[in-house]
Each structure stands twice: as C-alpha cells, then as structure tokens.
C-alpha cells in the first residue's frame, strides 16, 4: 500500500524510482535505461583518436599506443583521418604558422569532437611562451576538453587524461536537444 502511495506522491525523486525499478527488473534479466545513456556508454568505449604531434610530447603519445601501456584496452583506437576520429590529441608546441592547419583539421572532425591538450607547450606555450611565433595555448585556436600537464607528460598522465575525458563524456552527455 505504501509503495503505491510513494510512487504517485508529488516530488518523488525519479532517480530513486528508476533505481528501484532497475533492481526489480535485474532479477528477471532486464535493464531499464535511456537511449542517451546507451549512446554515452558506447561513445566512451569507442574513442577514435587522431594525433596532432608537434614536438617531444608526440614521442610520449606513441608510448601509450605501444604494448606496455596499450591505449586500446581503454576503448580507443588510432585513426589517420580527421573525418574518422572524434578525439584530437594536440601534443607539443603550436606555432602561429601551424595554428590555421590545426583549426582546419579540427573543423573536419565529425560532431561530437573532443580535444586533449598534452604538455606544457600545448597548454600554455611552455618553455617558448614568450616567443613571437608561439601560440600561448592551443585553447586559443580550438576548444580543449582535458589538459594534461608536464614537459613532456608521461604516458601514464596521458592515459589518465583519456580516462578523465571518458568520465566527462559519461557525465555530460553528447545528445544535443
């Protein structure tokens, strides 16, 4: 009797009601979820990344794809074309001459697209911050989702940045309403 009253009561938290229903249906082999949750789950487990390696950080990025760290176990796969990738990893010093090329490649990526800025130079100019030819952070050219600090950052730091991006995708969602 009280269960029926609580379900119809005004102000009941939908999340709690959904969790209770999930527990009941789980015993019978069913799962209750939304389409958006399924899409976000699939998107976090299938990031296709493209490198924009500009300097020393690109070497550390290559380490993450090798057998010791094996980035693919986190559900990421390298792609050579921006039209096939949804994650761009900017690694290294971005110069004023290279900035239009970075923006052009970013614009060729399909939506939703994500950017990881890897290393001090990509994050804010790094050692060359005061040079006339260096962009002081790739976030002045493209929107950045995750910053990975270091000079150069370790392969573990990049893997942690990818896991943070996956967490962000799960948390924020990707469907535009």
From Swiss-Prot:
* EC category: translocase
Q: Which Gene3D superfamilies match?
A: 3.40.50.12280
Query: Which reactions are catalysed by this chain?
Result: a quinone + NADH + 5 H(+)(in) = a quinol + NAD(+) + 4 H(+)(out)
Name the GO cellular-component terms.
plasma membrane; respiratory chain complex I
Q: Any idea which positions bind [4Fe-4S] cluster? A: 56-57, 121, 151
A GO term for molecular function: NADH:ubiquinone reductase (non-electrogenic) activity
The record's family statement is: Belongs to the complex I 20 kDa subunit family.
The record describes the protein's role as:
NDH-1 shuttles electrons from NADH, via FMN and iron-sulfur (Fe-S) centers, to quinones in the respiratory chain. Couples the redox reaction to proton translocation (for every two electrons transferred, four hydrogen ions are translocated across the cytoplasmic membrane), and thus conserves the redox energy in a proton gradient.
Q: How does it assemble?
A: NDH-1 is composed of 14 different subunits. Subunits NuoB, C, D, E, F, and G constitute the peripheral sector of the complex.
What is this protein's name? NADH-quinone oxidoreductase subunit B
- Provide the species name: Roseobacter denitrificans (strain ATCC 33942 / OCh 114)
């Amino acid at each position: 009797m009280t269960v029926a009253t609580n379900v119809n009561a005004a102000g009941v938290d939908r999340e709690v009601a959904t969790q209770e229903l999930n527990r009941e249906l789980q015993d019978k082999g069913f799962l209750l979820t939304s389409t958006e949750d399924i899409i976000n789950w699939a998107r976090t487990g299938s990031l296709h990344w493209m490198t924009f390696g500009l300097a020393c950080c690109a070497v550390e990025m290559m380490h993450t794809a090798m057998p010791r760290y094996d980035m693919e176990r986190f559900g990421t796969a390298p792609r050579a074309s921006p039209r096939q990738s949804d994650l761009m990893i900017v690694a290294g010093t971005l110069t004023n001459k290279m900035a239009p090329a970075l923006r052009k490649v970013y614009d060729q990526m399909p939506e939703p697209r994500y950017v990881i800025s890897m290393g001090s130079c990509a994050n804010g100019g790094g050692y060359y911050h005061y040079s006339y030819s260096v962009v002081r952070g790739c976030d002045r050219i493209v929107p950045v989702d995750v910053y990975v600090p270091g000079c150069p950052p370790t392969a573990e730091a990049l893997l942690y940045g990818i896991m943070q991006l996956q967490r962000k995708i799960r948390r924020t969602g990707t469907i535009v309403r």
